[in-house]
């Protein structure tokens, strides 16, 4: 069941990093169903082609682009691919991310750098690469970055990811103010644990913590990928025309519950 008007995003062009799977793919699929043309960016060409095929099978317009968000020149290329294939770029979704559970005392410098590079540096590189095109969008440009509530709370084993996400939150607020004169809206979405994603599987299910973590959510369950996709549509659509510098928390109330030792992950 779709809750938005048909063709709500018609005429818009979106670039989604991490678009080959998980939340990035869910967002791209929903955008395409609502009329947006999409560029899917990721490092795994096979995943991107599979995702693009599924979107095309539903009538969507999509182009896969193999690239690493840690490489600024490659992100410039991704933006150029959007312009060359669809004539514009109106929406940037930063969904590429890296995370793993590791107590800080065991975290290697390389592990720290990897997450910071993908999450924080990658988000900045994508924003910078997209700026000149977003500022001439006829729909008012949108930047939507997927973060988590790790940046707002102290979660054991996630110092690296929490620091990266807090950095993205701060970056997004700064860009929201800096780029407001260009009518570019910069917002973030903070998902909670989402069923069917690699992150939830790796951090909770594979470690036998899924049932426990679901109980920590105020609504008593994990979210669905469509919950995050719907939030992204809201911010990308005319409903978000007066929203910038905001963080939309979509976690079923998870972050409001304290972290205790038996649910520290």
Model-identified regions with their sequence ranges:
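Short, small/polar-rich loop/turn modules that mediate ligand/substrate recognition or access, typified
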Residues: 93, 180, 185, 243-245
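Alpha-helical segment proximal to the catalytic Tyr-Lys
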Residues: 132, 177-181, 241
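Active-site helix of classical SDR
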Residues: 127, 164, 172
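Short C-terminal tail/terminal secondary-structure segment
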Residues: 1-6, 153, 233, 244-265
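C-terminal substrate-recognition "lid" of short-chain dehydrogenase/reductases
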Residues: 86, 221-250, 255
């Amino acid at each position: 069941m779709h809750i938005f008007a048909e063709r709500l995003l018609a005429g818009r062009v979106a670039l989604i990093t991490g678009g080959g799977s998980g939340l990035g793919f869910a967002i791209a699929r929903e955008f395409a169903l609502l009329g947006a043309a999409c560029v899917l960016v990721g490092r795994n060409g096979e995943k991107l082609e599979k995702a693009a095929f599924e979107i095309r099978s539903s009538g969507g317009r999509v182009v896969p682009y193999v690239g690493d968000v840690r490489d600024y020149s490659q992100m410039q290329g991704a933006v150029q691919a959007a312009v060359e294939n669809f004539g514009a770029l109106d929406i940037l979704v930063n969904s590429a991310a890296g995370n793993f559970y590791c107590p800080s005392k065991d975290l290697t410098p390389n592990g720290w750098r990897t997450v910071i590079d993908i999450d924080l540096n990658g988000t900045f590189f994508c924003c910078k690469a997209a700026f000149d095109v977003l500022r001439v969008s006829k729909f008012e440009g949108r930047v939507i970055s997927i973060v988590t509530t790790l940046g707002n709370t102290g979660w054991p084993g996630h110092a690296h990811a929490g620091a990266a996400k807090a950095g993205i939150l701060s970056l997004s607020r700064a860009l929201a103010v800096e780029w407001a004169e260009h009518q570019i809206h910069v917002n973030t979405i903070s998902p909670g644990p989402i069923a069917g994603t690699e992150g939830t599987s790796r951090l909770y299910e594979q470690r036998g913590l899924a049932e426990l973590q679901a109980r920590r959510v105020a609504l008593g369950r994990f979210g669905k990928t469509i919950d995050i996709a719907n939030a992204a549509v809201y911010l990308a659509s005319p409903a978000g025309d007066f929203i910038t510098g905001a963080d939309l928390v979509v976690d079923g109330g998870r972050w409001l519950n304290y972290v205790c030792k038996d649910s520290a992950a």
